[in-house]
Amino acid sequence: MTTILKHLPVGQRIGIAFSGGLDTSAALLWMRQKGAVPYAYTANLGQPDEEDYDAIPRRAMEYGAENARLIDCRKQLVAEGIAAIQCGAFHNTTGGLTYFNTTPLGRAVTGTMLVAAMKEDGVNIWGDGSTYKGNDIERFYRYGLLTNAELQIYKPWLDTDFIDELGGRHEMSEFMIACGFDYKMSVEKAYSTDSNMLGATHEAKDLEYLNSSVKIVNPIMGVKFWDESVKIPAEEVTVRFEQGHPVALNGKTFSNDVEMMLEANRIGGRHGLGMSDQIENRIIEAKSRGIYEAPGMALLHIAYERLLTGIHNEDTIEQYHAHGRQLGRLLYQGRWFDSQALMLRDSLQRWVASQITGEVTLELRRGNDYSILNTVSENLTYKPERLTMEKGDSVFSPDDRIGQLTMRNLDITDTREKLFGYAKTGLLSSSATSGVPQVENMENKGQ
C-alpha cells in the first residue's frame, strides 16, 4: 500500500487537522469541491491565542466537512510536559537558556490523539498543514503510523494540482470569496507563530535573519520584558513537588494539572520568564532559528532542578543531564514513544523524579532574571553541618583527610607517568609556556 498519496483520493474519506485558519479552510473546501469526503479534526491544546474553540468545527462544516470534531488534548499535553520536566528532556540551550520542546510535545499529542479519533470514524487518510522543509511532516508521519498502521497520508501542500490552483495565501483568500465565504486574510506579521498550552514558537519570515531579534516579537504568553517602559514588579513564588510531580503554587493546590499549568503560565508570563532565542538543527540537519515562550515550563523546570541538585548525588545528576539531552533529541525527532525513549523516560522518572519532593521559593524579576530564596525538602542530602567552617563536631577529622589525600598519590603517580610518556613521543611540548606542568623523567631516579 502506498503510504503517501501525491494526488487527491476522490470519493474517499480524508481526515484533515483543521485549525480554522486560511490554509486549512481553503484546503478543506477545495477537497470537497474536487470530490473527496473531508472530515475535520481540531485539537484543543489550550492555545493562548485561540479565543473560541467551539466555533472552529462549525466553520469546518460550513466549508463542506462531512463531520467535524473538537478533540480535547489538554490533559494529555500537560502530562507529557510534566514528564519532559521530570526527565530533563531538553537538548537545545543557548547561554544557559533552554528551549522546552513545546512544539514537539504538542505534535506527539496531536499526532496520536487526532489519528485515534479518525480511526474511530473509519477515516484512514490524514492530511495536515506541515511543509516538506520542516520537522512536523516527519513527526506527524511517525506518530500517525504508530497509531494506525493502515494510515495513508495526503497533504494538499504536496499535491501539484492544489499548488497550481491555490499556491499562495492571496489565491486562497480569493478562492474562499469566490465560493461565497467572506474570508479576509489576517494582517501579515513579521513572523509565524505556533502555540499550545506549554509554549509558543515564533519563527520564519523576518526571524530567519539573525540581525532581527526578540524585540520584533509580540509575546502571547508573557510581556516585553526588554522594554523598560513595561513595569514588572518583583514577585515571590513557591513551587511544591511531590515525588516529581508539581502539586502546588504559592500553597494553592489544583483540581487538575491543566489548571496548575495555566496558573504557572500566568505567574511566569507576568515576568517574561522562559523566553529564549535558539539556533537549532532540524531533523533534516539544516539549521533554523526560533524565538520561544514557555513561562510555566520554565518556572517548574527551575524549581525541579533546584531540588534535584540538593537531593541526588553527582553521578545521578550527570546521568540525568546526559540521558535528558538524549531524550530531548528523540522527542524533537518525533520519537517520544519509541522504545529507546520509553526506556530513558522510565529510568529517569523511576529513579530520579520519584525522590523530588519539597518546595522552592523564587523571586522573579524581568525576563529570565530570578533568585532562589529558599529550598526545603525532607530528602535533601545537602547538610551544611557536614562542611561547616565553624568549630564543632565533624563527621571526619584532619587525620581522615590526610589519609584520603595520601591515597590520591596512586593516581597522581600514574598521571605523571602518562604525561612523561606523552612528552617523550612528542605529543606534549617542553615549552615553559605550556599549560601542562613540566614533567621530569623519574625513571633514572628509581621512581
From Swiss-Prot:
The UniProt entry, under CDD domains, shows:
ASS
Enzyme class at the top of the EC tree: ligase
Gene3D superfamilies listed in its UniProt record: 1.10.287.400, Argininosuccinate synthetase, chain A, domain 2, HUPs
Q: Which reaction does it catalyse?
A: L-citrulline + L-aspartate + ATP = 2-(N(omega)-L-arginino)succinate + AMP + diphosphate + H(+)
Recorded metabolic or biological pathway in which this protein acts:
Amino-acid biosynthesis; L-arginine biosynthesis; L-arginine from L-ornithine and carbamoyl phosphate: step 2/3
UniProt-annotated binding residues for ATP = A17, F18, S19, G20, G21, L22, D23, T24, S25, A43, G129, T131, D136, D194
Q: What is this protein called?
A: Argininosuccinate synthase
Q: Which organism is it from?
A: Shigella boydii serotype 18 (strain CDC 3083-94 / BS512)
